[in-house]
A protein has these predicted regions:
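Transmembrane beta-strands of outer-membrane beta-barrel pores
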Residues: 42-46, 75-81, 98, 114-120, ...
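Structural signature of outer-membrane beta-barrel channels/translocons
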Residues: 62-64, 95-101, 142-148, 183-191, ...
């Protein structure tokens, strides 16, 4: 049977649902159950603290526990706040898919997620995130709709930064923000799906934003992030993207950046081997 493989579908197998793998955000879908994935990501850009290139590298491991639960663990190495590379942060992420309405070549899914992060950096700006800059917790909701070759996904979450500066009076920084994203993905190639060995070319556009909830002087940022993605033999993907700021009133550490990442999945890595 000939059918289209959606652009954002990675790691497809004969018995698992497709995933919409946006480079800058998570979909509501999970990776295949009982599988493990290894990922290396890099962010490169011109920071505001120096003339060199700021860099952050993120090795990450992901586990598909079952069809509803998946967990991530990651650390970051960076020179963004110092003039040398150092171990910067660690974080854990868990996602629970609580709704699935699946049909032929389309589905609607929703998931809840939570993140906890520790960072060695101290608060220096009011762009709140848990990607290496800050220590804190985050919780949110994801909704993803798939139609054949096109996917649309939205995320909303609350970040609470846990930093010793919270005790300073008067307040010097924001500590709570509403973060959101709107992501789209589309399959460019192949036009006709034949087998799992075909290389897929996917194109994405993502809107990424944050609104500080407890700070009146620097309130928001809004970024756009177009990207391209290649999927090889349904088991690995290479993503390249550029994130830039159309509008913001926040003094940020980095306004524009390049992203490159490579990920490989080990299907059925967590399944128990049957004894003979």
């Amino acid at each position: 049977m000939r059918f289209f493989l959606p652009a954002f579908l990675l790691f497809a197998t004969l018995n698992t649902a497709g995933q919409e793998l946006f480079p800058y955000s998570e979909p509501a879908s999970n990776m295949p159950a009982k599988s493990m994935s290894l990922k290396m990501g890099a962010m490169l850009g011109q920071g505001v603290h120096g003339s060199g290139v700021d860099q952050r590298y993120t090795p990450e491991v992901m586990f598909g526990l079952n069809k509803k639960w998946m967990v991530h663990g990651a650390v970051t190495l960076s020179n963004m706040y110092e003039n040398f590379f150092y171990y910067e942060s660690a974080r854990v992420y868990a996602k629970y898919r609580f709704l699935s309405n699946d049909d032929v070549h389309k589905h609607f899914r929703m998931a809840a997620f939570a993140t906890a992060a520790y960072s060695r950096n101290h608060l220096q700006h009011n762009e709140l995130n848990l990607l290496g800059d800050h220590s804190g917790v985050q919780a949110g909701i994801i909704a993803t709709q798939l139609w054949n070759k096109f996917a649309l996904s939205g995320t909303a979450s609350i970040i609470e930064v846990l930093d010793e500066a919270r005790n300073n009076k008067p307040q010097e920084y924001a500590f709570q923000s509403l973060n959101y994203s709107l992501s789209t993905g589309y399959l460019l190639l192949p036009r006709v799906y034949k087998d799992y060995n075909q290389t897929n070319l996917n194109i994405y556009a993502e809107l990424l934003g944050g609104q500080n909830l407890d700070w009146e002087y620097e309130k928001y940022y809004l970024d756009l992030a177009p990207s391209l993605q290649l999927i090889f033999k349904s088991t690995s993907k290479l993503s390249v993207g550029y994130r830039f700021q159309p509008k913001s009133d926040i003094y940020r550490n980095m306004k524009n950046s390049w992203m490159i990442s490579y990920e490989y999945i080990f299907l059925n890595a967590l399944r128990k081997k049957s004894s003979k």
